[in-house]
Each structure stands twice: as C-alpha cells, then as structure tokens.
Amino acid sequence: MTDTDLLAGLVPERFDRHTIIFLFRPADATPYSDEELDRLQVEHLTYLRGLKDEGVLIANGPLDDQTDIRMRGISIYALPLTDALELANDDPMVHAGRFEIRGAQWLTAEGTIRFDAPGDSA
C-alpha cells in the first residue's frame, strides 16, 4: 500500500469552510475609563447581536485559559474571509483600538461540525 493509498482514507473528500476571526488585545490598546469600557462592551455586543440576527455571524465568544493572553475571543462567520474581515473591522471595539483582528478559513471534514441557526434548539 502506498502513501497515496493511505492518505485517501485519512483525508476527507469534501470540506466545509468556516471563517474564523480572532480578536486580540493590542499591546498598545487605547486606555479608557471603566465607564467608557462598559459602554464600548455594550456597543460591541450589540453589534455582534445584529450580525447574528442578519445570519452572517454563526457563533462568537470570549476565550479563557489561552496560551496568549492577548487573545480575547473568536467569531465564526458564514461569509468569505474578506467579507468577514470587513465586518469585524467595523466592530466598535476595533474602532476604539481595544481589539485588533486576524482571520482564517478553517476547513473541516464535511458535516462534522454543525452550528444551529439562531432560535434553533438541539
């Protein structure tokens, strides 16, 4: 059996694409008062809720116990990378200098990960 034969059984024939946006706290994050940070957090979460309601943001949330403490959260979009980056750059926390973003396309074997639409129940 050749390596090609072995790979044929290990590599999926089809992939699902997920666009992941990583939120990082920049080393030189703009300082704000606690009151201003609370307001920005409300604006940030409201913005993300709107993207979910539009059906372009699949899932999002903060990170915990990460290897790089600058990593603050991730968002998974139902969009191509360039479109997701454009929306992520419009996040009020990005505009305020509290987050910077990085993105990637994540390929998973077709059907192995399922995200419910808002309002769906498992």
Kindly give the residue locations of the regions a language model identified:
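Conserved, structured core segments of small domains
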Residues: 1-122
